[in-house]
């Protein structure tokens, strides 16, 4: 068997055994999530303020999309609340969403309103949701997520947390698009639509999904803490549009590193076409990421040169300088 083929097999094995989530954990996590959504719906529907729009609840994020890598630490859920005659408007040009309260909010749940206004405050709503979640069996604790867009729920029986985002679902706007309205971290609301992210991931083949996982692993092990997982995925979606899909994992991985070090200085487009440029990194952060990616790209080239000379073991050792534990 050629050194090329051996390297490809080892990379796939590395992904399956070192990077991918444990299959038993995944099965257990799916069941725990579905059961939790059922429990949350039952509890919230007892509170007239929260009338759950079950058909629009949404599982999203890297766990749902199949791009999560070890360890499984969080699962994302959106719990949709029925509008019940609440309305909203968009404050241009900052795209801040204001939700106008309904009769019940104003007269019976005014603790969720901005002070002396009729606007629904997303931070206050998160706190109300946090208090309601304490009624769940197996509850351990709940806190407002650091981005103030979700409630992080910890249950006693599982090692992973659940990040729960309360949301509303809009009617079609003038352009025909529908949106989820989620907390923006400042007490207001913002538009989102994670369904688009899922559609984009569903179009990828197995090799492309493996590249996402490898790059996430590289990002994590190389301590590039300024690179958020979602930003990486968006960059790689753009990269996949520029490269042939019929090449090996190691060539695609090498070229992905090249794409990162060349394009981290550029705009990173929001695939949902809502937020505009996602690249909020400062100059120093971009330079640091670019230098690390370029260094690893050069090492990958050296490894591939060794493969071309049929030096498989030396090539594996060289790749392990980029992917920790690869030669383990």
What are these regions (language model features)?
Residues 6, 32-38, 110-266, 324-328:
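Catalytic cores of NTP-dependent nucleotidyl/adenyl transfer enzymes across multiple folds
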Residues 4, 22-25, 29, 118, ...:
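Intrinsic-disorder-associated interaction segments
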Residues 1-18, 35, 268-328:
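Terminal (often C-terminal) interaction modules
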Residues 61-64, 79-83, 155-157, 166-168:
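Short, flexible loop/turn elements at secondary-structure junctions
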